[in-house]
């Protein structure tokens, strides 16, 4: 193999491949980035897999001699990122035991991986793909991710993508004390989803966030995998689907539509700013904020034995039979950070029951959170 690449063109793909291969993998096989050249296509293909997530990237290159080899992915990515901009030559030595990288007077060698370790990647489905926006997908993942349980052995450790009878698609995350739901309309994707929906584990969502660009993308589905590639097919990522039975999340969100719920409307930005200041007065053991609900205001208070106390009152429109709520300050502040500006609506089932949050500017996004059962003391 003998090629010349432009460092700026390929470093992104090498970094993505390196991000897939775990640095602490038990075997060198799972740390390998594989490089296949295509002289006719004037390109190289980068391939990496951690045994679950698979990445394939195609980048331009001047190919003098075709070849195929694997090297430790993180080392190659780190080296290319550390080199100055410009052309970089790569070739195998005579015995094929090393990949030689040179740029001007700089010369480096990386040992080659055993070719027998290579496992072919699963190809992108040839038919039935769906066009979408990478930016929208990443935004949805971000809005739901924090509500997904950190448990690989539970269905609650997954993002649920479920088609609804009205043509909508739900993206839901649950963790036992919080739930997030984004609902979109995409008729093409709706038609490709199985009736029971699909589940993607949280750890693979993290891979998607690292590897997908915000431009136009194509989605592919098989019974076992979820595929994403950009429209130019330069980068492709696929992750396995989980095979759990997901709970019926609709019962939680339907409960929050009941006429018996108390309703509070408040400025999201004012509420968030007050929580940020209250957080200053929290400690590791005293980490909650007390919210008192009046007719036209919310009083937000927190304290710590060693930090003092904070009390703020902000305007609100309240129709509530619930007078007091308690939340862990940091959790509530993080929750609100996923909403845009404008008026925030809270629907409250009871003082110790669930509360739902949504804004007037985004009716298709809602989060449910459970308050703390014990009141804040010392205020």
Question: For the regions a protein language model found, what residue spans apply to each?
Answer:
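Structural preference for solvent-exposed beta-strand-turn elements
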Residues: 1-379
């Amino acid at each position: 193999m003998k090629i010349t690449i432009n460092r700026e063109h390929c470093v992104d793909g090498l970094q993505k491949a390196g991000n897939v291969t775990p640095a602490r993998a038990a075997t060198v096989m799972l740390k390998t980035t594989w490089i296949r050249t295509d002289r006719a296509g004037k390109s190289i293909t980068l391939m990496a897999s951690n045994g679950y997530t698979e990445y394939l990237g195609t980048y331009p290159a001047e190919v003098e001699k075709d070849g195929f080899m694997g090297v430790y992915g993180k080392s190659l990515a780190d080296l290319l990122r550390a080199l100055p901009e410009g052309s970089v030559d790569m070739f195998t030595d005579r015995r094929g035991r090393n990949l030689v990288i040179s740029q001007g007077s700089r010369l480096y060698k990386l040992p080659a991986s055993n070719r027998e370790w290579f496992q072919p990647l699963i190809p992108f489905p040839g038919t039935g793909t769906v066009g979408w926006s990478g930016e929208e997908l990443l935004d949805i993942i971000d809005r739901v991710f924090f509500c997904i349980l950190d448990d690989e052995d539970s269905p609650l450790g997954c993002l649920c993508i479920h088609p609804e009878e009205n043509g909508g698609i739900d993206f839901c995350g649950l963790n036992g004390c919080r739930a997030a739901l984004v609902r979109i309309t995409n008729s093409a994707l709706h038609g490709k989803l199985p009736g029971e929906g699909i589940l993607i584990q949280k750890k693979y969502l993290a891979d998607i966030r690292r590897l997908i660009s915000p431009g136009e993308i194509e989605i592919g589905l098989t019974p076992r995998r979820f595929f994403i590639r950009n429209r130019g097919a330069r980068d492709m990522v696929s992750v396995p689907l989980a095979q759990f039975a997901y709970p019926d999340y609709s019962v939680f969100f339907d409960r929050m539509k009941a006429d018996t719920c108390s309703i509070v409307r408040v400025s999201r930005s004012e509420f968030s700013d007050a929580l940020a200041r209250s957080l200053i007065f929290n400690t590791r053991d005293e980490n909650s904020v007390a919210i008192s609900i009046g007719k036209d205001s919310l009083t937000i208070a927190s304290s710590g034995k060693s930090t003092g106390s904070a009390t703020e009152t902000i305007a609100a429109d309240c129709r509530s039979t619930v007078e007091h709520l308690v939340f862990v300050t940091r959790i509530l502040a993080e929750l609100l950070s996923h909403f845009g500006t404008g008026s925030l609506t809270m629907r409250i089932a009871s003082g110790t029951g669930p509360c739902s949050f949504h804004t007037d500017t985004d009716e298709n996004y809602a989060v449910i959170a459970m308050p703390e059962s014990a009141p804040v003391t010392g205020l």
